[in-house]
Amino acid sequence: MPFLDIQKRFGLNIDRWLTIQSAEQPYKMAGRCHAFEKEWIECAHGIGYTRAEKECKIEYDDFVECLLRQKTMRRAGTIRKQRDKLIKEGKYTPPPHHIGKGEPRP
């Protein structure tokens, strides 16, 4: 027990907010991946770690993708490479405001 337990004194539970997004949040705003985490926890609850690894893999993968956005970033990189390739070949010209030559806005 810490000498000054500030979290308890102010009625805060920051540890729970940081570990489980499904927990009650300070401003009643659900986390970005709240729905995916909730599905995963509901699936894995009560069946044990070994079974949960196999049976809840889809829910867990969705949750991890929401947190890390690896597939999304990989897809954005592929799209950017394709765009650069088309620009180099002369088959695509980006709009002026995408290359910094558009009209200045207030």
Swiss-Prot record:
This protein's name: NADH dehydrogenase [ubiquinone] iron-sulfur protein 5
Family in the record: Belongs to the complex I NDUFS5 subunit family.
A cellular-component GO term for this protein: mitochondrial inner membrane
Membrane topology: Peripheral membrane protein
Region (Disordered): 84-106
PROSITE patterns: CHCH
UniProt motif Cx9C motif 1: location: 33-43
Xref: InterPro entries: NADH_UbQ_OxRdtase_FeS-su5 (IPR019342)
Assembly mode: Mammalian complex I is composed of 45 different subunits. This is a component of the iron-sulfur (IP) fragment of the enzyme.
SS bonds (residue pairs): C33-C66, C43-C56
Keywords: Disulfide bond, Electron transport, Membrane, Mitochondrion, Mitochondrion inner membrane, Respiratory chain, Transport
Protein purpose: Accessory subunit of the mitochondrial membrane respiratory chain NADH dehydrogenase (Complex I), that is believed not to be involved in catalysis. Complex I functions in the transfer of electrons from NADH to the respiratory chain. The immediate electron acceptor for the enzyme is believed to be ubiquinone.
Domain named CHCH: residues: 30-74
Pfam families: Ndufs5 (PF10200)
GO biological process, one term: mitochondrial respiratory chain complex I assembly
Domain remarks: Contains two C-X9-C motifs that are predicted to form a helix-coil-helix structure, permitting the formation of intramolecular disulfide bonds.
Localization in the cell: Mitochondrion inner membrane; Mitochondrion intermembrane space
Motif (Cx9C motif 2): 56-66
